[in-house]
Amino acid sequence: MRQDKLTGSLRRGGRCLKRQGGGGVGTILSNVLKKRSCISRTAPRLLCTLEPGVDTKLKFTLEPSLGQNGFQQWYDALKAVARLSTGIPKEWRRKVWLTLADHYLHSIAIDWDKTMRFTFNERSNPDDDSMGIQIVKDLHRTGCSSYCGQEAEQDRVVLKRVLLAYARWNKNVGYCQGFNILAALILEVMEGNEGDALKIMIYLIDKVLPESYFVNNLRALSVDMAVFRDLLRLKLPELSQHLDTLQRTANKESGGGYEPPLTNVFTMQWFLTLFATCLPNHTVLKIWDSVFFEGSEIILRVSLAIWAKLGEQIECCETADEFYGTMGRLTQEMLEQDLLQSHELMQTVYSMAPFPFPQLAELREKYTYNITPFPATIKPTSVSGRHSKARDSDDENGPDDEDAVASAVGCLGPLSGLLAPELQKYQKQIKEATEEQTLRSNNIAELSPGAINSCRSEYHAAFNSMMMERMTTDINALKRQYSRIKKKQQQQLHQVYIRADKGPVTSILPSQANSSPVINHLLLGKKMKITNRAAKNAVIHVPGHPGGKISPVPYEDIKTKLNSPWRTHIRVHKKNMPRTKSHLGCGDTVGLIEEQSEGCKASSLGAAEEFPSGRTVTAHSEGSSGDGDGGGSTPRTIEGQSPEPVFGDADVDVAAVQVKLEALELNQRDAAAETEPKVHFPCQRHASELADAPGENQTAIKLLPGSTSKTPIFSPFPSVKPLRKSATARNLGLYGPTERTPNVHFPQMSRGFNKSGIGNSSTKKR
C-alpha cells in the first residue's frame, strides 16, 4: 500500500511537470531529486519504475549487494524496517540475522568450515568436563517450553552442543549462566540448525554486546547497571528519588546492614538474558532485532521504558519489601498477560532520545575506569583544580590498597573500632607520599574530559559518608553483641558457683574425693569411653588399705588379662579339680559356666567401674560400720553362712591362696543348693584372677559359692567350628543340672571329661 501511495504521488508530480512545460533537463532532474528527498527515511528503498531520472536497477532485496557500499545500503534499509511498528517480518528474521553474522565473520577472516570441525568435534577436550557439568545443570532450567519435559531430550542435546561449541570457540568467556536462555531463543529462530545458531551467538556476544560483558566477574555488566542508575536519575527523576528514599529507609531499619540499589535485582536479570525471562517471545524478538542493528544501548533504552511504564505502581510502595513484592507481581504480569504492548514499548524506546544516546559513552567510560567499592575520603573543595585531578587519578589507580585496608578492618572483628583510625592515618600518609608522583602521571580526565563531571566531589563525599557510616555501625553492632555474650557467660558462671555452694556438706563419697573431669554437655546421655589416660591420673581411696590409696594401674591391661579365654579356662579347671576327686557334681565345663549368677556379674561390673585401676579391694556390706585397720583381717558376715575372714594384708602370699583354693572341696550340699533359688550378693573377683599378674601386690578375697561371674566358653583345643549346645541335650541334662531337669549325675561321663580336661591342661602347661 505504501508503494502504491508513493507511486501515485510521483505520477502526480510528473503530470505537474508536464503542465509547467519543458523546463529543460536540469529542471526535471532537480524536481526528481526533490521528490526522492521527500521519501521518508523510515521506509525501505522500493522498486521505482516509469519515472524519468530514476535508476530502474535499484531494487530492495533480502541479500546485500556486493561490496561494502552494497552492504551498507542493505544495513540502513533493514535498520529502518526494524524501527517500524511491525518490525522485521518473521519470515525475514533468520536470513537477516545470518547475513549480519556472516558479514562479521568475514570481516575477521574466519575459516568457518575449520571452526565447525573444531567446535563440534566428538572428542572431549580437557576443559569440557567442568563446562559440561554446569551446562547440564542449567539445561533443565531453560525457560523455553520446547526444551522442557522428557519429550524434549533431543532438543536439549542440540542446545548443549551449541553451548559447548561456543565455549570452545571463546575460551575466555567459556560458559556463563544465562547462555542457555540466549541459545534456546536463537535455536528457535534458526529452526534448530547448530551451525547457524553458533554464528548468531558469536555475533551477539563478541560483536554487539560490550566487551567483557560475561567475563572478568561481569565487569561490563556492572558498568551498565551503574550507567542505568544515572540514566534513570536523568530521565525519570521522581521515580529515582523515590527508590533512593526506600533504599535509605531500608538501610536505617536494617541496623547496620546495607541495602543495594533496588533496581539492581531486576536489571541484572534483564541484561543477562536480554529480557527473555520477563517479556513475551514476540516482544523479545523485536528487541533483539533492534539490538542487532542499533547496538547494546537498546538494552538501556528498553529498561528505561519498562521502569517508566511501571513507575505509577512503584511510587505507591512505602517500603523496600513492598517494592520487591510489587515488582515480583508485575514481572509475572509482563511475561504472561502482556502488560506492555510491543509497539508502544518500541515507540518509547526510539523516541526517548536521539541515537546514539547522549553522554552514554562518557558514562560507560567513567564507570569502567572509576569503580571504587571503598573510595578514600574526599578532601575539601578549596584545593586547586590540578590537585583535584591528581586526587581523581589516585582514586582510580589505587582501589586495591583501599580494598585491602577495608578487608583488614573488617577481619579484626570487635577490635576494628580501635584500629580503624590508625589504619586510616596510615592510608593517608601513603597517599600523601605518592601524591607528587601521581601528579606527573597521566590522568583519565585528560584522556577523556567528559568522563568526570562537575559533581564528582559531591558524589564521592556522599558515597564515602554512607560507606563509613555502614562500617562504623557494623563495628559497633559487633562490639555490643560481643559484650552481651561475655556478660551472659559470666552470669552463667556465677550461677554455677551459687548452685555448687548451696547446702552443707554431709558426706564425701570416694568418687567425689577427686575433681570430676570436664564433660561436654552435648555428650550427656552417651556412654563415655574409658581410656588409659584417665586411669593413669586416677587415685582411689580405699578405707581398708594401709595407705588409704592405691596407685593407678592401667585399667584396660588388667581387664584384658582377667577376661582372657585362657585364664577363664584355668579358673574353670581349678573349680573342677575338687569335684573330680570326690566324683560328685557335673564335670561339664559348659554346665558350670551356665550356673553362674547374673547378680555377681552386675556387682563385678560395678566394682570395675568404681575402681578403674583394676585392683581388688575390701568389700563392705551395707550394714557394716567403720573402716578396718590396715593390718588385720576384717570379718564379713553373710546371711546363712559363717563369718569368713577377708585378708587385707597387701603382702599376702598368692601361692598359698592358690593352694588353699585347690584343696577346697565341694560337697553334695553345695551341688543341691545350685538348683534352689539363690540370693545374689555383691561379690568380688576371685584372687586367682589376679594371681598371674607378675610383680604386683594384691588384696585377695575368698570366693563365695555361687558368686562367680559368667565367663565365655573356651576350649584349649583348636577347632574349626565352635561347640554348639543342643536344646534337647540340655533338657535331658546332658550339659548338667538345670531348672527343668533333676540333679542327675553321670560318673563315667564326668570321669572322661575330667580326665581329658586334666590331660589337656597338663599338656598345655608343658
Swiss-Prot record:
Residues 751-766 have a biased composition (Polar residues). The keyword Transmembrane does not apply. Residues 422-491 form a coiled coil. The modification Phosphoserine is found at S642. The keyword Isomerase does not apply. Its main location: membrane. Pfam families: DUF4682, RabGAP-TBC. Residues 87-295 form the Rab-GAP TBC domain. Residues 380-406, 603-647, 731-766 are annotated as: Disordered. InterPro entries: Rab-GAP-TBC_dom (IPR000195), Rab-GAP_TBC_sf (IPR035969), Tbc1d30_C (IPR032738). It is a peripheral membrane protein. Keywords: Cell membrane, Coiled coil, Membrane, Phosphoprotein. It is found in: Cell membrane. GO terms for biological process: negative regulation of cilium assembly. SMART domains: TBC. GO terms for molecular function: GTPase activator activity; small GTPase binding. Residues 393-404 have a biased composition (Acidic residues). One of its GO terms (cellular component) is cytosol. PANTHER family: TBC1 DOMAIN FAMILY MEMBER 30, TRANSLOCON-ASSOCIATED PROTEIN TRAP , GAMMA SUBUNIT. May act as a GTPase-activating protein for Rab family protein(s). This is TBC1 domain family member 30.
